[in-house]
Structures are given as structure tokens and as C-alpha cells.
A protein has these predicted regions:
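Disordered, low-complexity "stalk" and linker segments at domain junctions of extracellular
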Residues: 1-154
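Trp- and S/T/G-rich repeat-edge/linker motifs of beta-rich repeat architectures
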Residues: 23-43, 115, 125-144, 176-201, ...
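Predominantly extracellular/luminal cell-surface or secreted proteins
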Residues: 60-64, 101-105, 161, 169-176, ...
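Secondary-structure junction/capping motif
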Residues: 67-70, 173, 265-267
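Beta-sheet-dominated scaffold domains
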Residues: 1-5, 151, 157, 165, ...
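Conserved, compact domain cores that house catalytic/ligand-binding motifs in diverse enzymes
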Residues: 146-183
Length: 298
């Protein structure tokens, strides 16, 4: 039961017993199978230094082409009016700018105070913005029983679903950064997301059907994950059950606006589509007149 999705020459492969991988085609006869590293490509600066010790500072690197921010550097202490200096990262993309964060004494949280194009920054007693904090490294698929079993692209994010430890969860990467699961506190609009498809019982996420909204097919029900007219973010996601048929792990087929999937029980093929009269998605039985074709084929 290998889950997969494709973008151009890159196939993303998932299986509940193995770490996620990509299969990339680099030539007509050249293929590369790689384990996905869930971390930003952009690296933080190193060697932070300043004068004094009253405040703690960290710095991140930012790369304009991808909009990706690194995790925070190692911290350095200095006085509030000193100049902070640091060294550009030795590997990864060359940063276009650096973001500087400061932690007030006994606060415990770093807040944004400014950006630098070069490798120095002078703090002129700037009050940190605690609504804007540096990204925190996160890899939800780092261990056995934490490997996802289904995957799909949706709204410039890569969605993963169903580990052995969390069969009813969905994880979405940062926008446009398909190997980046990092988050900030509080979360930002383009941060990675984690959703639990709650129901009266724990139903395993079997597949995704990315349409105008994201349809999540589980072992016991079909759910609509929507954000209205806005892009997915932590503030606007709604999860609504649509029907209670249940699906197998067999990948659904999308034809126009219809989703064809195999029901989890009963040798039934269903077509799920939007029904105007109920303002929801309903799964109709396509095999009702041809039951004989599906006998002993569940």
C-alpha cells in the first residue's frame, strides 16, 4: 500500500512502514530515490557576537526566491545598544537578508526587532514584536510508526495523512516549501499545519481528493476541509463531514468534479460530487446495477 503523488519529474512516495521518499527523474534513463529531509534549505548564520549580556538575540536567514526562512541561529547575549555581528551560512542558498529577534529578560520568547542586508545589526532599544517569532524546527515523521501513508498536493502545500500513531491526522507543509514542516509561536499564515479529522470514532485517513476544497477520505466518512475564499491558514480552516460511507486505501480517481472511490465495506464503487440541494458532497452508488461484477473482488 504505497501512497504517491507527482509534480513534474518528482514522485513523492509514502508507506506506513517507511520514511517518505522522492523518486526524481533527472534524465531519460536517470532516476534518483531519496529520503525526504524535512528541514528548510536555507541555513542560519553562525558566530553571533556582541558586547555585554543584558539581552539574548538570535538571527535567521531569509531567501527571497523561495520565501523561506531558516531556523534560528545559536543565541548570543549583548547589551541593548550594542552591534550584533554574525557570519553568513557556509552552505545552502545565499541569504538575501537576515531577520533579528530579541528576548527580553525573563520573557522566554524571542520577538522580531528588524532585518539586516549585511552581517551586522545595531539594536537601538527596539521593543521585540512577540507576535512575530522565529521558526521552530519540526519533523513529524522522524520515527517508526510516525510515517505517513497517503499524500497529495493542495493549494501549494504537500499534504500527508495517517501514521500508525496518529491515523486520523493530516499534516500540511509550508506554502510552496514541500520539505518544510516548521512552525512559529504564534503560528503564521504560511506555516505548516496539523489537523485532526475528528469524528465519533477514530477513522484512518485513507486518501485525499484535492478539488476546490480538500476532500479527505477516511475509513468511516468523507470530510470537506475548506478555508472559504482564502488560502489555507491556521485561522480559517473548517472541517465538515459530508457523508458516512468510508473508503479503502485504493487511490481515488478524479473525473471533472467527481471523485470515484471504492467503499470500505460492501463491494461498492461510489461517485462523490457536490449536491446543490444539500450544499454538500454526496457519494452515489455507481455499482448498484452491476453487483455481479464486484462479487469476490473486495
Amino acid at each position: 500500500e504505497i501512497g504517491y503523488t507527482q509534480s513534474a519529474d518528482v514522485l513523492t512516495l509514502v508507506h506506513r512502514g517507511n520514511a517518505p521518499r522522492t523518486l526524481g527523474r533527472t534524465g531519460h534513463t536517470s532516476w534518483t530515490l531519496s529520503t525526504i529531509t524535512f528541514a528548510p534549505e536555507t541555513q542560519p548564520p553562525t558566530g553571533l557576537s556582541g558586547t555585554g549580556s543584558a539581552y539574548s538575540y538570535v538571527v535567521t536567514s531569509f531567501y527571497d526566491d523561495t520565501g523561506e526562512e531558516s531556523v534560528a541561529s545559536a543565541a548570543a547575549n549583548m547589551d541593548e545598544t550594542s552591534t550584533l555581528s554574525f557570519t553568513a551560512p557556509a552552505s545552502g542558498p545565499v541569504p538575501d537578508r537576515y531577520y533579528v529577534y530579541k528576548m527580553k529578560p525573563a520573557n522566554g520568547l524571542y520577538g522580531f526587532i528588524g532585518e539586516a542586508v549585511g552581517t551586522t545589526f545595531t539594536d537601538s532599544t527596539i521593543i521585540p514584536d512577540l507576535e512575530d517569532t522565529p521558526p521552530q524546527a519540526r519533523n513529524p515523521f522522524a520515527a517508526t510508526d510516525d510515517y505517513p501513508s497517503t499524500v497529495a498536493y493542495y493549494q501549494q502545500r504537500l499534504a500527508f495523512g495517517a501514521t500508525n500513531n496518529d491515523p486520523d491526522k493530516v499534516w500540511l507543509t509550508q506554502i510552496g516549501r514541500f520539505n518544510n514542516m516548521n512552525v512559529s509561536v504564534p503560528q503564521k499564515a504560511d506555516d505548516a499545519l496539523t489537523l485532526r479529522i475528528s469524528s465519533n470514532e477514530v477513522n484512518r485517513v485513507q486518501n485525499f481528493a484535492p478539488l476546490d476544497s480538500l476532500i479527505v477520505l477516511t475509513s468511516g466518512a468523507e470530510h470537506l476541509v475548506t478555508s472559504g475564499d482564502s488560502a489555507f491558514s491556521v485561522d480559517n480552516i473548517k472541517i465538515k463531514p459530508q457523508d458516512y460511507r468510508g473508503s479503502t486505501a485504493l487511490k481515488p480517481i478524479i473525473l471533472g468534479g467527481d471523485i470515484l472511490f471504492v467503499q470500505g465495506q460492501g463491494n461498492v464503487v461510489r461517485s462523490m460530487s457536490y449536491a446543490l440541494e444539500s450544499d454538500s458532497y454526496r457519494a452515489q452508488d455507481l455499482s448498484i446495477l452491476s453487483r455481479h461484477l464486484f462479487v469476490n473482488n473486495s
